[in-house]
Amino acid sequence: MMGARWFRTVAMVLLVSLVHLTQAGAGSVTDDGRIRGRADAPITLIEYSDFTCGYCVKFFKETWPRLQAKYIDTGKVRFVYRDYPRADQGVGVEAAVAARCAGAQGRYWPMHDRLFSEGGRLDSGAFKGYAKVIGLDQTAFAKCFGERQYLESIFQDRQEANRWGFHGTPGFILIRTVGGPTEKEPAIAIPGAFPFEEFVEEIDRMLATAPRSQGAPTEPHGSTAVAQNSQFIIH
C-alpha cells in the first residue's frame, strides 16, 4: 500500500454543500462541457490544472490516456477539469479563457487537448489558430476571448482547489458520486502528477466498494460534489 506518503485523505468536518454533476451540464455556463465520461459513473476524478504547468502536461501526455482507456471510456469514472491558473494574469489565464470560449460552442475538449499538446504554443495568435482548426465560429470566439469572459468562474475554480488544500498544480480529487452518503465519505486528495499505477490503486480500492449504478442522476446540472464553506482535516 502506498499509505499517507502518497495521498492525503480529506475529511469534511462541517456541513457540506453538495452540487451534483451530470453530463447534462455540458455547454452550461457552469461547466462548458468540462466533463468526460458517463454521468452515472460511481467515481469522479477532478483535476485542478494550469495549461502552462509542466507537470500538468506530463500528466496529460503520460497518465491521462491510460486513465481514459481503463476507467473513463469504460464508464467506471467520470473526469472533470477545473482551472487553476498559477498567476492572476498572463498566458495561463488566457489559455483557460480560450478553452472556456471553445466550450461555449461545445468544443471544450478539442481546445483543451490542443492547449496541452502543442508544445508550449500559448499566445493569442495560437489560440485563434486552434479555434479555426477545431471549427469554431471565429467571430464569436474572438468576442468571447477579447472580453475575457469566464474570468470569474476560472478563479472560482482556483478558490475551490484552495479549499481542498491545493496550492500548486496539478491537484486531483477522487470522490464517490453515485449511491451512499457521499457527503460522509472522505475524499482522496492527490497532490501532484503521480504515476498511473498510483491512480489505479486508489480508484480500484474505491470501485471495490462502489454500489451498482442505478442510471444517470436526475438532479439539476452543475459542478461536481465539492466542499463549500467547510473545513477539512488533512492527514
What are these regions (language model features)?
Residues 9-20:
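Bacterial N-terminal signal peptides
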Residues 41, 49-132, 137, 206-210:
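Structural alpha/beta surface segment adjacent to cysteine/selenocysteine redox centers
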Residues 27-43, 71:
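A short beta-strand-turn-helix
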Residues 35-36, 122, 190:
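Short clusters of hydrophobic/aromatic residues that line enzyme substrate/ligand-binding pockets
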Residues 44-47, 78-81, 171-173, 189:
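Soluble periplasmic/extracytoplasmic beta-strand elements of cell-envelope proteins
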